[in-house]
């Protein structure tokens, strides 16, 4: 019985107020909730401390976008330079919390689809960003995995290198077999945010 929980606290805004977070969790518990998805960014440490103490399980989410922007000035501007450092700090900070049962590497990232900008990188850019054992010659071969699938593999591998004990997922909003995150084959749990009626049609 889980919910997606954004980091703001209503009229209090995004500032951390431990008592307000505790009250929020108490209300959720009274509703029968026992699971939290931190959407769509790392939560305040205070939230995880409270979830540890109050008996919630947490899906801890790192990113709301990768390299393809959703708004003009979002994290996509910094992804190439900062994603490894931020993912490293995120996992190391949160991995000792017993409430955390799964990592999420992204929410509805636009790299799910073939028309995402990630598929139009030059070979040099792709190798620079991915650095995942694929030469530019390999990437150029017909039938080679998409850059988006390789990026998914890279992120999951990075997470598993820091914490091999927990499954990794991503929140996806188009359940079809062409989804590059699905096609990577590395997500332990396939996240479907919508289109429940279509789920039986996806292998």
Name the predicted role of every residue range.
Residues 1-115, 141, 153, 168:
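Active-site-adjacent substrate/metal-binding segments within catalytic domains
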Residues 53-55, 79-203:
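Active-site neighborhood of glycoside hydrolase catalytic domains
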């Amino acid at each position: 019985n889980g919910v997606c929980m954004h980091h703001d606290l209503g009229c209090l805004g995004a500032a951390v107020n431990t008592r307000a977070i505790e009250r929020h969790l108490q209300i959720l518990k009274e509703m029968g909730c026992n699971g939290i998805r931190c959407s769509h960014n790392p939560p305040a440490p205070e939230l995880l401390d409270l979830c540890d103490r109050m008996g919630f399980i947490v899906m801890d989410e790192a990113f709301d976008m990768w390299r393809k922007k959703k708004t003009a000035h979002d994290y996509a501007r910094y992804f190439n330079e900062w994603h490894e450092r931020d993912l490293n700090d995120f996992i190391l900070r949160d991995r000792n919390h017993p409430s955390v049962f799964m990592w999420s590497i992204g929410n509805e990232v636009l790299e799910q689809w073939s028309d995402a900008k990630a598929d139009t990188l030059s070979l040099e850019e792709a190798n620079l960003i991915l650095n995942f054992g694929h030469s530019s010659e390999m990437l150029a071969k017909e039938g080679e995995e998409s850059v988006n699938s390789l990026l998914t593999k890279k992120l999951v591998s990075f997470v598993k290198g820091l914490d091999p004990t927990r499954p990794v997922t991503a929140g996806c909003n188009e359940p079809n077999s062409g989804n590059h995150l699905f096609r990577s084959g590395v997500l332990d749990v396939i996240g479907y945010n919508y289109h429940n009626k279509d789920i039986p049609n996806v292998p």
